[in-house]
Amino acid sequence: MMNMIEWTKHVLESDDTKLIYWLTLLMVCMIVDTILGIVIARINPKEKFSSFKMKTGILIKVSEMIIALLAVPFALPFPAGLPLLYTVYTALCVSEMYSIFGHLRVVDDKSNFLSIIEGFFKQTYRKDKGDK
């Protein structure tokens, strides 16, 4: 177990490996979103499986990944480049997670992410108030 912790510390020492970590996380989120979308469209009788929608979604994900990869050599020479890349990668990951939550019916298309977080904190605060 200690070797794993040391390895994780070593991996996250440099900015290069942090960028690779964020790109890997983004890629995993995209793969999970795509697989969930295909599986849910296939097994849910209410959803009509559309190969056009699937191809469009995959094309959008591939283009987002290409832009994310091409942004690295353009952003790193500038002082604010690295924080900008982290911000963009975080936004892309949050967008993919929102899409995953949409597939799982945790959120719908009419709600926004901040209202979901706000509702969560309001419910948590009410529970804490009731316990006292």
Curated annotation (Swiss-Prot):
Residues 1-61, 108-132 are cytoplasmic. It holds the Pfam family Phage_holin_4_1. GO terms for cellular component: host cell plasma membrane; membrane. Isoform Holin has 3 transmembrane regions whereas isoform Antiholin lacks the first transmembrane region. NCBIfam families: holin_tox_secr (TIGR01593). Belongs to the bacteriophage holin family. phi29likevirus holin subfamily. This is Antiholin. The gene is 14.
